[in-house]
Amino acid sequence: MQEKDITQKMLERHNDVFSDIVNVLLFDGKKVVEEETLFDAVTDSALKIDGRVRFQDRDVAKYWKDSQINIALFGLENQTTPNKLMPFRVISYDGTEYGKQSRTENIDKKKYPVISLVLYLGFEQKWLYPKNLLGIIDVDEKLKPYVNDYKINLFEIAYLDREIIDSFKSDFWILADYLHQMRVNRNYVADNKSIGHIEELLMLMSAMTGDKRFEEIIDEANTKEVVNMCEVLDIVEARGIEKGIEKGIEKGREEGADIISRLNTILAKEGDLDKIIKANTDKKYRNELLKKYNLLRDYEK
């Protein structure tokens, strides 16, 4: 889980990917947020709870600026499995940023909204938990009019309409396409769309699929200047074949050593040292003995 979380962050921290996600999910694909207007925000913060200092860390956060003025803070939170308490987490993240704006040193500065996007990257099941605060807490009906509700902006990437998925222009399209195909077909067929951030994407694919070959081929992919997932999968497949051959050779060595050991044991019991020496130096004679004692039978199937 932690590995997936880290690799998702690596890809989304790139401004072209981050702005693409925001523009497609919030603005119907219109290029409202430009790459150059995004600036990294601090993602970790400390809270004092029950007398102890506890730390919380957003996945990715960026300020959207006009000149030096903050228009908004966007935060991305990735989830590969549904989390019933996600509204609590989002409130905590957002509240920390609003709390920062309320400090004395910021009193005269322009105030800006905090917008968190929860990206659900699972494809085995839909997100069935409530997406608002009142959906997860028990509230007496007499109190309900006074309890502020808080909803989360949750996007189930694998379940987006195909038209929306195809609106992504960055490497995030490759991830969204993969999730969609796995949900619908339980199989992935690569596309020839160009990859912008090869290392980050391959590490993410390695974490999402559990196939370490994606990560193992990063250097080779960079050397060969791989440009799309079709080429990536060609290398991955070749690496698999190569490993299969290596395993076959190793297995053959082990089986060969086992046969020779069994032959030497038989000859030793016969007490014929000359046979042992000749069997280990004369290949033709050794093969005759192997056939004579039926030692090849188990390995010829």
Across the structure, where does each feature detected by a protein language model lie?
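Elongated, amphipathic alpha-helical interaction scaffolds
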Residues: M1-K301
